[in-house]
Amino acid sequence: MKTTFLDFEQPIAELEAKIEELRFVQDDSAVDISEEISRLAGKSQQLTKDIYANLTPWQVAQIARHPQRPYTLDYVREIFTDFHELHGDRTFADDLSIVGGLARFNGQSCMVIGHQKGRDTKERAMRNFGMPKPEGYRKAKRLMELADKFGLPIFTFVDTPGAFPGIDAEERGQSEAIGHNLYVMAGLKVPLIATIIGEGGSGGALAIAVGDVVQMLQFATYAVISPEGCASILWKTAEKAPEAAEALGLTAHRLKALGLIDKIVSEPLGGAHRDVKGMAAMLKRSLAESLRQFQGVSVKELQARRYERLLAYGKFKETGAQE
């Protein structure tokens, strides 16, 4: 598949186009231009390194939304074996913006749950662009409870603009569904490892991300609102999205510094979409490391750690306060 370049990547796109043109010429020419192709390839790689070393939060947000970025099912194919998808919330419907099911991770049985956006127009409409309705979150809750019953670790993959804000979703109890998930995750007797792989949009992301370990891919985002939404509220125009992205502190490094996530998983040069298999291999290693730390941990200790972790959010200490 031909790589789609973002606006700030246009200098890279121009170099890659020249390289592709030279490769096409070399196929039909007796002249050896392989050295020139290698020189340009090296230049392109260095340019990519330079651009990606100085990304703004708004540019990171664009990478997190890249149309070729790997989604949950891409990672399921690369990381897990024997995946068996489970459907429906047993209450209303089967929301396809949430996928989940039983699988094996390094031979160990587990439960996998994640958002799924869709690749083309038809699939995006079918999956509601990765924005779950209440039945999606209730499906996730059902699968978590099933995993809890059989003592299976849970892996969740977060990639959503947010919970669907439509009237029908509100009528069926969107906020209740999200809140109930938070309650269930807090009391699980099995470890839950959450990974933000793309967009982590507000409560729609949090509804499957109350983890014992929360990690983010290097160019993923996690925030209470989208930059455009924030800009529209504060500045009355979405054109201020770059400033809003800066103010929201939505990048992995900013959130790690604040203690809101535990780990950052590095991405291949140019983002996860440039090397899906390489990205999956790095993520698999990180998931294995995270899961190992719960070996031999009792249910009581697991829940106590989680309780302390949740209570630590939002704590602060005043220094230098005047008497």
UniProtKB/Swiss-Prot annotation:
GO terms for molecular function: acetyl-CoA carboxylase activity; ATP binding; carboxyl- or carbamoyltransferase activity. Pathway: Lipid metabolism; malonyl-CoA biosynthesis; malonyl-CoA from acetyl-CoA: step 1/1. Its main location: cytoplasm. Pfam families: ACCA (PF03255). This is Acetyl-coenzyme A carboxylase carboxyl transferase subunit alpha. One of its GO terms (biological process) is fatty acid biosynthetic process. PANTHER family: ACETYL-COENZYME A CARBOXYLASE CARBOXYL TRANSFERASE SUBUNIT ALPHA, ACETYL-COENZYME A CARBOXYLASE CARBOXYL TRANSFERASE SUBUNIT ALPHA, CHLOROPLASTIC. Belongs to the AccA family. Component of the acetyl coenzyme A carboxylase (ACC) complex. First, biotin carboxylase catalyzes the carboxylation of biotin on its carrier protein (BCCP) and then the CO(2) group is transferred by the carboxyltransferase to acetyl-CoA to form malonyl-CoA. InterPro entries: Acetyl_CoA_COase_a_su, ClpP/crotonase-like_dom_sf, COA_CT_C. Its EC number is 2.1.3.15. GO terms for cellular component: acetyl-CoA carboxylase complex. It is found in: Cytoplasm. Residues 39-293 form the CoA carboxyltransferase C-terminal domain. Keywords: ATP-binding, Cytoplasm, Fatty acid biosynthesis, Fatty acid metabolism, Lipid biosynthesis, Lipid metabolism, Nucleotide-binding, Transferase. Acetyl-CoA carboxylase is a heterohexamer composed of biotin carboxyl carrier protein (AccB), biotin carboxylase (AccC) and two subunits each of ACCase subunit alpha (AccA) and ACCase subunit beta (AccD). It catalyses: N(6)-carboxybiotinyl-L-lysyl-[protein] + acetyl-CoA = N(6)-biotinyl-L-lysyl-[protein] + malonyl-CoA. The keyword Nuclease does not apply. The gene is accA.
